[in-house]
Design a protein with these regions (language model features):
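N-terminal "first-domain core" detector
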Residues: 1-41
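Short aromatic-glycine-(Arg/Gly/Cys) micro-motifs in beta-strand/loop hairpins
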Residues: 31-61
Length: 143
């Protein structure tokens, strides 16, 4: 598989959740970081699937190697659904409720649209997060 094919699969899938991958300014499909622009650089070659990151100060983040296409796509989708669901959670904040409740709910909804394997894997990731950092709901202040 080529980097171009990887991008096309991600682009096509993400259209189903209303995301235009060309508008995401922190994900690139290229083997080399362009001018050290901050973001994640995904690429594929005959040996597998990879991601190299560039930090906001130009620091190169070590390369990740994925076992297969599904792992690479999950990494992409996990990040993009974070962006979308965080925006959703901010706009739909409920006083006294941990903001992660609507974020995780929206994120799982998006992953479900992308496919059951991504949804199930996302559920496991969220369970790990909540095991170490449970929801912190508070009572709204009474006036």
């Amino acid at each position: 598989m080529t980097t171009r094919q990887l991008k096309e699969i991600a682009r096509s899938d993400l259209e189903r959740i209303g995301v235009d991958i060309e508008q995401i300014r922190s994900i690139f499909f290229s083997e080399t970081p362009g001018m050290n622009k901050a973001g994640s650089y995904y690429y594929a070659d005959s040996r597998g699937f990879y991601c190299t990151g560039v930090g906001d100060r130009g620091r190169i983040i070590p390369e990740k190697k994925f076992r297969n296409l599904e792992d690479a796509l999950f990494d992409i989708y996990w990040y993009i659904t974070f962006l979308v669901s965080t925006d959703y959670a901010v706009r739909n904040k409920i006083p006294g409720q941990d903001w992660r409740r609507p974020m995780f709910s929206k994120r799982l909804e998006l992953l479900k649209t992308l496919g059951d394997p991504y949804y199930l894997r996302g559920m496991k990731e969220i369970e790990v997060i909540l095991a170490s950092s449970p929801y912190r709901d508070s009572q709204p202040m009474k006036q």
